From Swiss-Prot:
Glycosylation positions in this chain: 144
The keyword Ribosomal protein appears for this protein: no
Protein name: C-type lectin domain family 18 member B
SUPFAM superfamilies, per database record: C-type lectin-like (SSF56436), PR-1-like (SSF55797)
Disulfide bonds: 236-249, 251-260, 327-441, 417-433
Organism name: Homo sapiens
SMART domains according to UniProt: CLECT (SM00034), EGF (SM00181), SCP (SM00198)
Amino acid sequence: MLHPETSPGRGHLLAVLLALLGTTWAEVWPPQLQEQAPMAGALNRKESFLLLSLHNRLRSWVQPPAADMRRLDWSDSLAQLAQARAALCGIPTPSLASGLWRTLQVGWNMQLLPAGLASFVEVVSLWFAEGQRYSHAAGECARNATCTHYTQLVWATSSQLGCGRHLCSAGQTAIEAFVCAYSPGGNWEVNGKTIIPYKKGAWCSLCTASVSGCFKAWDHAGGLCEVPRNPCRMSCQNHGRLNISTCHCHCPPGYTGRYCQVRCSLQCVHGRFREEECSCVCDIGYGGAQCATKVHFPFHTCDLRIDGDCFMVSSEADTYYRARMKCQRKGGVLAQIKSQKVQDILAFYLGRLETTNEVIDSDFETRNFWIGLTYKTAKDSFRWATGEHQAFTSFAFGQPDNHGLVWLSAAMGFGNCVELQASAAFNWNDQRCKTRNRYICQFAQEHISRWGPGS
């Protein structure tokens, strides 16, 4: 067992006095923790740091190695509570055991010694030395020996520490009380036997998800589980700021990329900047790296041209509202069939397309096609996506069949959107908007005019 070295003479004397004179406690209590004003004789910041560092160093020295040992952090609330208990000079009181924090179990190590006999650091080191008499394999202390200070000191799940010291008077003898409080506490018993303080194994190999980091200082023998400083396992370059909740870098102006590693000074003249790719998304009718070039309308992509309007038939399927959005992104709208001529030409084309055209997305539910007509419950009528009233109609026989169930349509999305139905010679049918259909985008003259002149 590794432990801090003390001079042989003084170490032997301390051990004897601990056995003969020292009064010790190592217990678990549900106390009341409150923010209080600093008490006279409380540990200063340097002493607190030394005790915390010593505790963590000793916890990293346990043998066999601990797989789940937590790193301790200093708690001013626990320190105030420990100071208050040290001031009792070993006299138990029920008042400390009552209060608001009954659910928080706190473990205690306490030592009473003649004043000046030992420093707090030496007392903690002697608590750890009790481990020489503790068998981790058997989970018990040697006969007629005390190990409870040791087991509390190395209790794996304890994560907070606070200590206090007080000079007491006992007749003509000055007594010094040393107290440390640990939260959560340890030394739990099952059927009269104290359970082992930690699980053995490779350091940090059994850390829980909330403390998945592994802390190891230069003077530590092994690692201690801690809240990871950087759970994303990444860092942002060029003064980027890491959001550890999303593991995303917020880059300063002029930089982009996952780690802000790409210098980007691109300006989009007619478009918006896509930060993650350092590129421009151009407005309709513009192209080029900076969206500065006026481009011609891509008439070669039209499947049909009717009276100057361009119609594009999708090779993929989607819901009605997603299909409408995709047409809008291209600068058009879902097809608006306002005459028998357009209806006849589309029906003829789609009938031929049914057996000749390949699709890139076979995950569609029907062989039908969305057009830009929906039922508006507020107006109790079908309207085109532009808001225009539907004057021309080509509903199939018996359709629309959900028109009378307005409440059902609104509540469940039945029959609110219109498709060209293959089984009815591509006449219209009202359908659930969440159905996945192919769709037809239309580019009328007002859409095409936004592009550069072309043929």
